């Protein structure tokens, strides 16, 4: 189980929810361990997890076309409700293995007409026909929400995506283990990409090597911003046929996904001497991140972390440095709470995993960025990284 269920139950009690319903891809996977593929690859497909209060088991609601993923993934929730038609046949002359037996059993179960009918059926079986139910508003379509409210008029449905965010902000030991591995694999991909760095290599060639390393290590590419020279100042640079030249800066702002969890990090390198200004400015953004390690601990106001990191970069060499944020949480989503911004009202808590970053973009010059994945410990900070933060000269 990935989810921090004790925290979920505590927040449900605090907010007065009799049940909560996960509807977006990240929350469905987080709460159940079930990866509803169609939710992740296109907009619109409906999958839900009903999580009642004490005394009732949770339920996964999923389209019949995804039932094969249940034995493949073995989610901790055993009650699976399907909806929609999908035909699959069984060769009755052979002995089915355990996975196929479970598939056959699931395809033999009742098929509801649509996702809302399946959800309503599960709720009524559990006696959830009145009271207050939290619903993650980010995945359910407006039409489905209208149908749900019409079918259960005595329930007060309250938006609760923010509740799921609060739950996900504090990671379990298993989540931290996965995030640590995701970071290691992504660092290896940066090393792999830089191993081919020489004059004439293109940004696209470097991205291909980066992505290949992720796939070879059971991860999937998600973000691959790799830019050379002045193109490194493009905020969301997409690799092109730009060739690497001596003196170029190489900026990585990259990430992948491993076992449903994200990685996000940034590093810089240069082919030969990049010049004094790049060295000076890079050292400033690096010191901003390192200053974060000095002060991160439970109870620190996130807004104060933001202010100290920005002030450090300004003091260390970029006096005009300005940012809307200098990091964010990370987990099943690339941007979990907290958002490290001046406006944040959050405080750091033990076992948050955050990305601390100090990007600087100057058109006509370069983009410089250091970003680390960091766990908040009971008395400080633990880096999930192994690569040095300094500018790497190739």
Report the location of each language-model feature.
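Active-site neighborhoods and metal-handling regions in enzymes and metal-associated proteins
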Residues: 1-394
């Amino acid at each position: 189980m990935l989810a921090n269920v004790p925290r979920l139950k505590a927040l449900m009690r605090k907010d007065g929810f009799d049940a909560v319903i996960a509807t977006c891809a990240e929350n469905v996977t987080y709460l159940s361990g079930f990866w509803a593929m169609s939710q992740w690859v296109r907009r619109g497909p409906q999958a839900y997890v009903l999580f009642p209060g004490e005394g009732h088991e949770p339920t996964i609601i999923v389209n019949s076309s995804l039932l094969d993923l249940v034995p493949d993934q073995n989610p901790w929730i055993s009650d699976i409700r399907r909806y929609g038609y999908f035909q699959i046949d069984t060769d009755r002359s052979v002995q089915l293995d355990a996975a196929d037996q479970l598939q056959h059993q699931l395809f033999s179960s009742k098929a509801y007409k649509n996702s809302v009918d399946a959800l309503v059926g599960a709720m009524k079986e559990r006696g959830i026909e009145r009271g207050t139910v939290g619903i993650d508003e980010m995945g359910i379509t407006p039409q489905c929400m209208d149908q749900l409210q019409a079918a259960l008029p005595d329930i007060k449905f309250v938006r609760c995506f923010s509740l799921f965010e609060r739950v996900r902000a504090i990671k379990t030991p298993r989540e931290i283990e996965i995030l640590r591995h995701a970071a290691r694999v992504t660092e290896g991909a940066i090393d792999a990409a830089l191993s081919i760095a020489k004059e004439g290599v293109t940004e696209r060639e470097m991205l291909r090597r980066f992505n290949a390393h992720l796939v070879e290590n059971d991860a999937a590419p998600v973000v691959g911003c790799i830019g050379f020279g002045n193109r490194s100042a493009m905020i969301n640079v997409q690799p092109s046929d730009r060739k690497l030249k001596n003196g170029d800066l190489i900026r990585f702002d990259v990430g992948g996904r491993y076992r449903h969890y994200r990685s996000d990090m940034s590093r810089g390198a240069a082919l030969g001497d990049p010049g004094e200004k790049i060295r000076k400015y890079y050292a400033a953004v690096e010191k901003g991140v390192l200053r974060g390690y000095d002060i991160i601990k439970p109870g620190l106001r996130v807004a104060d972390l933001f202010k100290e990191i920005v002030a450090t970069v300004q003091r260390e060499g970029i006096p005009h440095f300005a940012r809307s944020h200098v990091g964010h949480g990370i987990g099943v989503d690339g941007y979990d709470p907290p958002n490290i911004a001046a406006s944040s009202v959050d405080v750091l808590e033990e076992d948050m995993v955050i990305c601390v970053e100090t990007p600087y973009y100057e058109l006509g010059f370069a983009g410089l960025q250091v970003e680390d994945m960091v766990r908040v410990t009971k008395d400080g900070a633990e880096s999930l990284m192994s690569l040095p933060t300094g500018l790497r000269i190739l």
